[in-house]
């Protein structure tokens, strides 16, 4: 895979008008937050943007500003498809018909397994989250950030770092989080509460089924649970 090119991505964002954004199957906070942050920012500079979540809005992230602008099905053919937080082309959560007109595929991701499937790639495995890359992209491209966009970025970064508990929490990650909180007055405690405490009945039932499979070995250092297709 070629080296990531900020300039190529920025050129695409500046040159074209019609964008469709998507992320991986069963999206998490980083995928959804990255889609919202980049999509809302492009909207603010007059671009036509469609943010697609075919599986609908996960209850956990229903609080995010702009989430109501996402759609489950595309309504137009884009000039550019922006893939966020998706390591493989096959996992990109977008209908195949969007590719029939050969739009430019831009791949923005942080997974080390990403093979650079886009025509333009911005893949940074050292980044803790795709939201971290999107933040840097918005700054480099001089694209706007406001409170809703900052909330999406913070949620993206916080969820992929375990709210700054994982080993991928670097000084840059903490610096970005601090900027988002200080400059846009976003509420970290409320975001953490919504992410960790908002659960659908279906997710709670699934958790109960998985916990019911818990087994502990004779050696108490080992325990395991399992999740199978029937549970989901």
Functional labels for PLM-detected ranges:
Residues 65-120:
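Active-site cofactor/cluster-binding pocket
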Residues 108-178:
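Short alpha-helices
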Residues 1-7, 98-105, 125-134:
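An acidic intrinsically disordered interaction segment
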Residues 3-8, 87-88, 137-140:
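Short, motif-level signal for alpha-helix interfacial/capping segments enriched in acidic residues
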Residues 12-13, 74-75, 97-100, 114-115, ...:
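Solvent-exposed alpha-helices and their adjacent loops that cap or buttress functional pockets
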């Amino acid at each position: 895979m070629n080296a990531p090119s900020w300039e190529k991505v920025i050129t695409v964002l500046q040159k074209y008008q019609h964008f469709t954004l998507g992320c991986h199957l069963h999206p998490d906070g980083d995928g959804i937050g990255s889609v919202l942050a980049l999509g809302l920012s492009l909207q603010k500079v007059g671009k036509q943007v469609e943010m697609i979540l075919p599986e609908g809005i996960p209850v956990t992230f229903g609080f995010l500003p702009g989430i109501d602008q996402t759609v489950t099905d595309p309504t137009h053919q884009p000039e550019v498809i922006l893939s966020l937080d998706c390591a493989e082309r096959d996992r990109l959560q977008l209908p195949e018909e969007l590719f029939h007109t050969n739009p430019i595929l831009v791949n923005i991701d942080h997974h080390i397994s990403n093979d650079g499937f886009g025509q333009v790639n911005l893949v940074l495995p050292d980044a803790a989250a795709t939201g971290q890359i999107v933040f840097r992209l918005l700054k480099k491209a001089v694209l706007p950030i406001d409170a809703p966009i900052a909330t999406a970025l913070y949620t993206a970064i916080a969820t992929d770092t375990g709210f700054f508990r994982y080993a991928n929490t670097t000084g840059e990650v903490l610096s970005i989080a601090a900027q988002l909180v200080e400059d846009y007055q976003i509420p970290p405690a409320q975001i953490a509460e919504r992410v960790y405490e908002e659960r659908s009945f279906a997710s709670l039932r699934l958790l109960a089924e998985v916990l019911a499979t818990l087994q502990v070995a004779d050696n108490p250092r080992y325990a395991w649970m399992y999740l199978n297709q029937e549970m989901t």
